[in-house]
């Protein structure tokens, strides 16, 4: 008995303190929720479950003290016999003795029945206790998950600006499972422990109050010490979690931006950033281990001291004939078990306390009522919206940057059915205006009205439903094309979808895809080209049949051909709708009814194209800038001959992925989502994780062997203390079963009491050392594993990240949970195992010496208990894997919704995501309920076995004593040594769930750590030539993306660029242009053919060396959430970049002045993924970043496509400056930007179709010529 308590005695005995004080104290030490609030989501059935479970737990708890009553009476029966055989001198007494022995056996049979009866009761109530509490918890957690997700979906955009997306995902997974841990069977165990406590004390007082009071005198000391430790511990737990949360955020950001990290060789830097955050968590963890173990050691010292005192006093009472020895034992054990049970309660209290902490954050978010409530039913829903819009004196600044005023008194009127174009420089408030109209934010002052009605009085959802939005970077969800369009409006029919798709000019390309409307678009739509995504987004907006259409640079990121098609679709869509267009390319807005010029947060001029050209204001300036430099660039808009388009669509399939890939660069960051949710869960379940042995896990910790040696030694000593206790205990009782004089009794009992005290001192020392050494080793291991896993993740090649199983969400979850779970299976757990083995081992050896017959009987029983434990472990381990997998599925849905929250909101699809999330929780929920029963059955069986073994043991013991084969003293010794030992083994089985999880986690970890990618970013092999001239050659290169092996991208591409030349790649969207850049960066290797650099094959070159000479600027640059200076310095991670260099690069990229104008200059943080900057600003920072590398080869992947005229002009100048003296490969949609390239190559269907200079190609009158004329035509 005593052992099982003592391990948990760890955080010990604080119960009394906590129960009473918790409310008061916790209030000051924010933030936890009150005890009853924890159960705010319990329905009546849950309450019933909890009630019945609690009753069962209380009955179960009383069983142990009751057994002590039986035990005491039984000891008296033995003792009365024990005093006889010594007088057995003659035959007469001999006969008399056999009567007595006969009577003893009879009595023992009765006691055996009592024991069995108690056991049978326990079998039933223990099952009810565990399964009912687990059921209640499973049901509540299911509700909490849904409520929490609902609450997140219900928040307004401003809330997301200030909350970290990664953190929300962690809360959804980790914090909710913490609540789960805290409100399930642990509470049942707590009530059980409390019942044992009260039961024990009641029996103690009724059977012998004097002794009880003496034992009680020591309890407050125990309670106090424990209470203090518990407080200290919980504060460490919080700090540790915070410390890891930071590291987790770093990991999420890095994995999301993995392409950027790889291209800039930032792995080392990121590893360091991650590692520094881990260091903090490790330090706190070690402190926590020390604290926990001092408290445990102290508790043991006090416990043994109380034994010493109790036995010393108890013997005095027996000698003075006040109590019988049986009474002393009953009182002693009942009170002791009672006191210990508080120790047992403590881990449960700790779990509950952790749960309260986790619930605080979660319930807070659930209770946070947004000021713009998208679920609200209130608000006016006009029957007929004409679409007259008015912005009156609008002032606004973003909640995350209140000091920066964006709009400063904006006034604008739009008549129903008009098209208004907003033009102006990047960052002047155009997009903000559109966001205010959708009520993603409310203005700080001023009114936005529709048909004269303040939009704040209109129902939010209704308002957003009458608005269709197409933005610059459309977000598609990881499902089919049809489903994506359905996100526009829920009850839309297939006919309506087809109609919308035709209007959006997307029907033809969809019908050419192998699965047509059921084609999966991939994470963030990664399998489609930009033009295709954009058209699907338009179809999605049209299917809503909106009264108001908002086009936020809907065509800026497209190439000429796609743009022509998309623009045509938009023009069709605008008919009869009030439309607000934001465009950088002014050609797209010439035919708007009103053009409004923005400057400095207000509208400075409005009128149509002709009027504004006469006014010669901002618009005029913008137009002139565009026409001067970019003759043709406007062209992108106009239609192409039908057959060209089909052609384009065919090819765009080929490399659908390529363009995408580029986009996904930035996108993937925002959307750790899987290819297809259905697939994710299924596949994940079949995932073959090689099983792994315990030793393999320990090996991970091998470098901490000195800690282990000390720890294991202490654990062995600790284990041996238990049998030592049994010996002393049986000797004490033995003193009274022998017929000796009082003086000898007094002397013996004093000696044994002293020995108890010595045991205490030893245990204090060994517990502390054991805990400290294993705790430290465990923390070092956790840190090392997280580091190794992260390091290994960063080492993988890009195709590994393309794999739907390795989305950002899935990987960050791995990092967060796996290492912690492995720690669970090493250090402290190993200590418990060693301790228990030592305990049973010494116990068995001693028992065999003192009474082999009884030992053998007991050893027959013990395995049954052990087997039950093993079965329990097996059942749970299968469960562990399934649990994890199933929740990953719902995690993906959640991450997708949270990451793309703006899109979800503007499509008013919060409800849809909630339903999907709820759907994905069904299976884990059903399994939780199933598990409750399994857990209940195994638990009750192991518990009840103990009582049955008591019955068998003492009945057989009586038989042996009667035959004079053993003395009662030895029966006790053998019994306590073996039974306590066995309980200790039960303890090992009780940690089954953790171990099962740890094995699964460890296999994952080892799988990741040992995975060597085909393109190894860390490899030191390969050539590192001293000079690099920059001659690039592609020879018959064949390639397709690993995730879509059936779609060829490059089909025998030949290209050559001489050093210092600028090569421009043009072609329709998805023809393989970006792929060229990715192959040169060695994100992928070609399937056939070779890429040469200065005549050497790139796969012969050292990867790091190769990438160090390439500078890349892509269409949607990814910035990290740190300062501008740090973002620029990221360009060269191989050295420390000085502030001068940073500024020089910034000047070259034309962004220095802008940075200097910011309040914090170069130390301004750019926000998550650079959200605090406009596109043009981000782009220039990205260019500065590429220049800091001083690359020999510059890769520009549509670096200016997403910019407005003014930014573009500036950026283009920066790029022209940057190209000087470098080999440069440019991918451009706007042909004006590449007229002066040394070589222009037209790619179609993955092959080169034409090449030459601008003039030569125009003379050929081929594909290039027609592209140029399309663009120029648009211009005129």
From Swiss-Prot:
Extracellular-facing ranges: 67-113, 206-212, 314-327, 730-753, 851, 955-970
Q: What is this protein called?
A: ATP-dependent translocase ABCB1
Q: Which GO terms describe its molecular function?
A: ABC-type oligopeptide transporter activity; ABC-type xenobiotic transporter activity; ATP binding; ATP hydrolysis activity; ceramide floppase activity; efflux transmembrane transporter activity; floppase activity; phosphatidylcholine floppase activity
How, per the record, is this protein's activity regulated? Translocase activity is inhibited by verapamil and is sensitive to energy depletion. C1orf115 regulates drug efflux through modulation of ABCB1 localization and activity.
Which subcellular locations apply to this protein?
Answer: Cell membrane; Apical cell membrane; Cytoplasm
Matches recorded under SUPFAM superfamilies:
ABC transporter transmembrane region (SSF90123), P-loop containing nucleoside triphosphate hydrolases (SSF52540)
Question: Which residues belong to any copy of the ABC transmembrane type-1 domain?
Answer: 50-354, 708-997
- Reaction(s) catalysed by this chain's protein: ATP + H2O + xenobioticSide 1 = ADP + phosphate + xenobioticSide 2; ATP + H2O + phospholipidSide 1 = ADP + phosphate + phospholipidSide 2; a 1,2-diacyl-sn-glycero-3-phosphoethanolamine(in) + ATP + H2O = a 1,2-diacyl-sn-glycero-3-phosphoethanolamine(out) + ADP + phosphate + H(+); a 1,2-diacyl-sn-glycero-3-phosphocholine(out) + ATP + H2O = a 1,2-diacyl-sn-glycero-3-phosphocholine(in) + ADP + phosphate + H(+)
Query: Which residues bear sugar attachments?
Result: 87, 91, 96
**Source organism of this protein record:** Cricetulus griseus (Chinese hamster)
Q: Which cysteines are joined by disulfide bonds?
A: none
Q: What does this protein do?
A: Translocates drugs and phospholipids across the membrane. Catalyzes the flop of phospholipids from the cytoplasmic to the exoplasmic leaflet of the apical membrane. Participates mainly to the flop of phosphatidylcholine, phosphatidylethanolamine, beta-D-glucosylceramides and sphingomyelins. Energy-dependent efflux pump responsible for decreased drug accumulation in multidrug-resistant cells.
């Amino acid at each position: 008995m005593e052992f099982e308590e003592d391990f948990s005695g760890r955080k010990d005995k604080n119960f009394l303190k906590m129960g009473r004080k918790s409310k008061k104290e916790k209030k000051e030490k924010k933030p936890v929720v009150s005890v009853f609030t924890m159960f705010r989501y319990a329905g009546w059935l849950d309450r019933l479950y909890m009630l019945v479970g609690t009753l069962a737990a209380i009955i179960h708890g009383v069983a142990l003290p009751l057994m002590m009553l039986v035990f005491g009476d039984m000891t008296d029966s033995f003792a009365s016999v024990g005093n006889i055989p010594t007088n057995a001198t003659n035959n007469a007494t001999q006969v008399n003795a056999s009567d007595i022995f006969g009577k003893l056996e009879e009595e023992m049979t009765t006691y055996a029945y009592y024991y069995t009866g108690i056991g049978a009761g326990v079998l039933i109530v223990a099952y009810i206790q565990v399964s009912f509490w687990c059921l209640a918890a499973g049901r509540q957690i299911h509700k909490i998950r849904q409520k929490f997700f609902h609450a997140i979906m219900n928040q307004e955009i401003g809330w997301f600006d200030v909350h970290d997306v990664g953190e929300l995902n962690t809360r959804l997974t980790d914090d909710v499972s913490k609540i789960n841990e805290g409100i399930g069977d642990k509470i049942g165990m707590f009530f059980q422990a409390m019942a044992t406590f009260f039961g024990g004390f009641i029996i103690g007082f009724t059977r012998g109050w004097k002794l009880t009071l003496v034992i009680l005198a020591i309890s407050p000391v125990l309670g106090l010490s424990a209470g203090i430790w518990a407080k200290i511990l919980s504060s460490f737990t919080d700090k540790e979690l915070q410390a890891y949360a930071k590291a987790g955020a770093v990991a999420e950001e890095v994995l999301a931006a993995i392409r950027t990290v790889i291209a800039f060789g930032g792995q080392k830097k990121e590893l360091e950033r991650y590692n520094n955050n881990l260091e903090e968590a490790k330090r706190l963890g070690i402190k926590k281990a020390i604290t926990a173990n001092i408290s445990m050691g102290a508790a043991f010292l006090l416990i043994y001291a109380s034994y010493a005192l109790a036995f010393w006093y108890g013997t005095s009472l027996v000698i003075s004939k006040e109590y019988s020895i049986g009474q002393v034992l009953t009182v002693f054990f009942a009170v002791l078990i009672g006191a210990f049970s508080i120790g047992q309660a403590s881990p449960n209290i700790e779990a509950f306390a952790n749960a309260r902490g986790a619930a605080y954050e979660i319930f807070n978010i659930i209770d946070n009522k947004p000021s713009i409530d998208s679920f609200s039913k209130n608000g006016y829903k006009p029957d007929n919206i004409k679409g007259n819009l008015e912005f009156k004196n609008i002032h606004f600044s973003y909640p995350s940057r209140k000091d920066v005023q964006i709009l400063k008194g904006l006034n604008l009127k739009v008549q129903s059915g008009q098209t208004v174009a907003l033009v102006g420089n990047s960052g002047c408030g155009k997009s903000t205006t559109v966001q205010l109209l959708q009520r993603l934010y409310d203005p700080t002052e001023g009114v936005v009205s529709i048909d004269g009605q303040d939009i704040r009085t209109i129902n939010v959802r209704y308002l957003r439903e009458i608005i269709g939005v197409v933005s610059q970077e459309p977000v598609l969800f990881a499902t089919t094309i049809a489903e994506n369009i359905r996100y526009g409006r829920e009850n839309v029919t297939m006919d309506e979808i087809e109609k919308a798709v035709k209007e959006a000019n997307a029907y033809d390309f969809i019908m050419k895809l192998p699965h047509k409307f059921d084609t999966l678009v991939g994470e963030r739509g990664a399998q489609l080209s930009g033009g295709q995504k954009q058209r699907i987004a338009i179809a999605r907006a049209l299917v809503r049949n909106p009264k108001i259409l908002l086009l936020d640079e809907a065509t800026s990121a497209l190439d000429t051909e796609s743009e022509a098609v998309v623009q045509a679709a938009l023009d069709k869509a605008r008919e009869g709708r009030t439309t607000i267009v934001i465009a950088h390319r002014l050609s797209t807005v010439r035919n708007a009814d009103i053009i409004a010029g923005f400057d400095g947060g207000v509208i400075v001029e409005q009128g149509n194209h002709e009027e504004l050209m006469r006014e010669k204001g901002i618009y005029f300036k913008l137009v002139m800038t565009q026409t001067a430099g970019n003759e043709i660039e406007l062209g992108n808009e106009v239609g192409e001959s039908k057959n060209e388009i089909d052609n384009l669509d065919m090819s765009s399939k080929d490399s659908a992925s390529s363009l995408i890939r580029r986009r996904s660069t930035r996108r993937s960051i925002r959307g750790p989502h899987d290819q297809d949710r259905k697939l994710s869960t299924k596949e994940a379940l079949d995932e073959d994780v090689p099983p792994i042995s315990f030793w393999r896990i320990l090996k991970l910790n091998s470098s901490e062997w000195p800690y282990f040696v000390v720890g294991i030694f202490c654990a062995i000593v600790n284990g041996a203390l238990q049998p030592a206790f049994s010996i002393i205990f049986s000797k004490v009782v033995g003193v009274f079963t022998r017929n000796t004089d009082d003086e000898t009794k007094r002397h013996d009992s004093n000696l044994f009491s002293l020995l108890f005290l010595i045991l205490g001192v030893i245990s204090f020392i060994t517990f502390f050392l054991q805990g400290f050494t294993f705790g430290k080793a465990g923390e070092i291991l956790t840190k090392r594993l997280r580091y190794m896993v992260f390091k290994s993740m960063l080492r993988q090649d890009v195709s590994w990240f393309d794999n739907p199983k390795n989305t950002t969400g899935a990987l960050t979850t791995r990092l967060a949970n796996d290492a912690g779970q492995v720690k669970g299976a090493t250090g402290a757990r190993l200590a418990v195992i060693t301790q228990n083995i030592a305990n049973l081992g010494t116990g068995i050896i001693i028992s065999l010496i003192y009474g082999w017959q009884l030992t053998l009987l007991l050893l027959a029983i013990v395995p049954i208990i052990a087997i039950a434990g093993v079965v329990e472990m097996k059942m749970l381990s299968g469960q562990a894997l399934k649990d994890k997998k199933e929740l990953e599925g719902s995690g993906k849905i959640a991450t997708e919704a949270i990451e793309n929250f703006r899109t979800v909101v503007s499509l008013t699809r919060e409800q849809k995501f909630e339903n999907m999330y709820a759907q994905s929780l069904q299976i884990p929920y059903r399994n939780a309920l199933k598990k409750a029963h399994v857990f209940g059955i195994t638990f009750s069986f192991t518990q009840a076995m103990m009582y049955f073994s008591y019955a068998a043991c003492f009945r057989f013991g009586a038989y042996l004593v009667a035959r004079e084969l053993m003395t009662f003293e030895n029966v006790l010794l053998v019994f306590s040594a073996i039974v306590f030992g066995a309980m200790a083994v039960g303890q090992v089985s009780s940690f089954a769930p953790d171990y099962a999880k740890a094995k699964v986690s460890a296999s994952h970890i080892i799988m990741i750590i040992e995975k060597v990618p085909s393109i190894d970013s860390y490899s030191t092999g390969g050539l590192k030539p001293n000079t690099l001239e920059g001659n690039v050659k592609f020879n018959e290169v064949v390639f397709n993306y690993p995730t879509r092996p059936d779609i060829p991208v490059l089909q025998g591409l030949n290209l050559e660029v001489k050093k210092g030349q600028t090569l421009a790649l043009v072609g329709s969207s998805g023809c393989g242009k970006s792929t060229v850049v990715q192959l040169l960066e060695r994100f992928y290797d070609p399937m056939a053919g070779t890429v040469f650099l200065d005549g050497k094959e790139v796969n012969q070159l050292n990867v790091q060396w190769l990438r160090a000479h390439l500078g890349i600027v892509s269409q949607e640059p990814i910035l990290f959430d740190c300062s501008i200076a740090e973002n620029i310095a990221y360009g060269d991670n191989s050295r420390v970049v000085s502030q001068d260099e940073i500024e020089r690069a910034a000047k070259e990229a034309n962004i220095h002045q802008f940075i200097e104008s910011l309040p914090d200059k170069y130390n301004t943080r750019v926000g998550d993924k650079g959200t605090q900057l406009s596109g043009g600003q981000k782009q220039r920072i990205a260019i500065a970043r590429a220049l800091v590398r001083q690359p020999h080869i510059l890769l520009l992947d549509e670096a200016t496509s997403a910019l407005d005229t003014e930014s573009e002009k500036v950026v283009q100048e920066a790029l022209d400056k940057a190209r000087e003296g470098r080999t440069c490969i440019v991918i451009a949609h706007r042909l004006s930007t590449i007229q002066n390239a040394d070589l222009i190559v037209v790619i179609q269907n993955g092959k080169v179709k034409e090449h030459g200079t601008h003039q030569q190609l125009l003379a050929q009158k081929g594909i290039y010529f027609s592209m140029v004329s399309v663009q120029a035509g648009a211009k005129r």
